Design a protein with these regions (language model features):
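Short C-terminal tail/terminal secondary-structure segment
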Residues: 156, 247-249, 260-272
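Active-site helix of classical SDR
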Residues: 121, 167, 175
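Short, small/polar-rich loop/turn modules that mediate ligand/substrate recognition or access, typified
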Residues: 82, 183, 188, 259-261
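Substrate-binding pocket helix/loop in short-chain dehydrogenase/reductase
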Residues: 97-98, 102-110, 229
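Canonical Rossmann dinucleotide-binding motif of NAD(H)/NADP(H)-dependent dehydrogenases/reductases
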Residues: 3-33
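Residue(s) in the substrate-gating loop at a strand-loop-helix junction
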Residues: 151
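Alpha-helical segment proximal to the catalytic Tyr-Lys
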Residues: 126, 180-181, 257
Length: 272
């Protein structure tokens, strides 16, 4: 297995794409620290990984908590004594046209999609540098992987998502910058921009509570899905969580050891 013995941290892995990512990495031998806002979904992912013969541990909590990054990284080090793969997947949308968008809506997207990954990566910097220096002194070249998640909205914009598009564009800038900073430590930092994937975010409109307990509308109009599948997506359908996870997995394999600072779209042919 290509990831045998690696330690992977995945945020937002209790359901949907995040769960598919965690299960894919575990199926290839990685030991996964599974994060979700709630203990239930995180535990369900861990149980599914265990049933499939993999190894994982749950770490519930909101990625927007100021100390989340430190605690998340500490859990990986305490449980598995390693840190090889980080996938910053957690997120959601809170759409509105700009004239109706509140400061709270705009800031919420920056908090979860930009500030949270920044804090996780900042917390990971000390152990990553420490491991890399020890490996260099021993004459070993060991690559680590960071995969940040952006969106086609961050690449080309999307009406009603000025907050989400701004945040996901920032993720790309963070990815490219960190690829330059961490190259000396043999860390590949790449980004996957998802198109329209069949998850609760593309289900018919409904309301859910976010990390702060606020009610937010999630999902899309059914007419949009029909238009996407018949007119906008060249491959003619939405993607599955498993197909989205495969894009992330590619950046976690040894085959990506000389690829860094790149953005790949997993969107069925949608390009900008």
């Amino acid at each position: 297995m290509k990831l045998d013995g690696k330690v992977a941290l995945v945020t937002g892995a209790g359901r949907g794409i995040g769960r598919a990512i965690a299960m894919k990495l575990a199926s290839e031998g990685a030991r996964v620290v599974v994060n979700d806002l709630d203990e239930g979904p995180a535990g369900e992912t861990v149980a599914a990984i265990g049933e499939a013969g993999g190894e994982a541990t749950a770490f519930a909590g909101s990625v927007t908590d100021p100390d989340f990054g430190e605690r998340f990284v500490a859990r990986a080090l305490e449980r598995y004594d390693g840190l090889d793969i980080i996938v910053n997947n957690a997120g959601y949308t809170w759409d509105n046209v700009i004239q109706k968008m509140t400061d709270e809506q705009f800031q919420a997207m920056l908090d979860v999609h930009v500030t949270a990954p920044f804090r996780i990566l900042r917390a990971a910097s000390e152990p990553i540098r420490r491991f890399a220096k020890a490996e260099a002194q021993a004459g070993r070249e060991v690559f680590r992987k960071v995969v940040n998640i952006s969106s086609v909205s961050g690449l080309g914009g999307n009406p009603g998502q000025v907050n989400y598009a701004a945040a996901k564009s920032a993720v790309i800038g963070m990815t490219k910058t960190l690829a330059k900073e961490w190259g000396r430590y043999k860390v590949n930092v790449n980004c996957v921009a998802f198109g329209f994937i069949r998850t609760r975010m593309t289900q018919p409109l409904t309301t859910e509570r976010d990390a702060s307990g606020r009610e937010v509308v999630v999902g899309v109009q059914p007419a949009l899905i029909e238009a996407l599948e018949t007119q906008m997506i060249p491959l003619g359908r939405l993607g599955t969580p498993e197909e989205a996870a495969n894009g992330v997995y590619l950046f976690c394999t040894p085959e990506s050891d000389y690829i860094s600072g790149q953005v790949v779209t997993v969107g069925g042919g949608i390009v900008f």
